[in-house]
Amino acid sequence: MIDNLFVVKVLLRRGVWRRIQLSSRHTLHDLHKAILEAYDFFDDHLYAFFMNGQPWRGEAYWSPNNDEGPYADKIKLGNLNLEIKQKFLYLYDFGDEWTFSIQVEKILETDDPVLKPIILETRGEAPEQY
């Protein structure tokens, strides 16, 4: 079965980014967990993905325990019609508002399923979360 692989660059600030590979079967919640792992953050706050790149505006997908949906754990990357160079925003911790810019760098076809997101590359030191 043919599957798509997405390679995304997750930028926190200039010089601090992570490159992550996920399959079209992974959800936005899987991407959330991979970002936190890549930046060594604890998973103890709400989050949202804003598909137009603007916080608190437009099409958004929310953490599963948020009051409103649609929920990130129900949205597969393969259903988002992502394109190369497309950018969207990940906002973590609605109090501190950690803001990450995500850019789709590659979309590859594979018949080898990727079971877990893979952190391909890191650049720059991750800041302290607290």
What are these model-predicted stretches?
Residues M1-Y130:
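Short linear regulatory motifs enriched in tryptophan with gly/pro/ser
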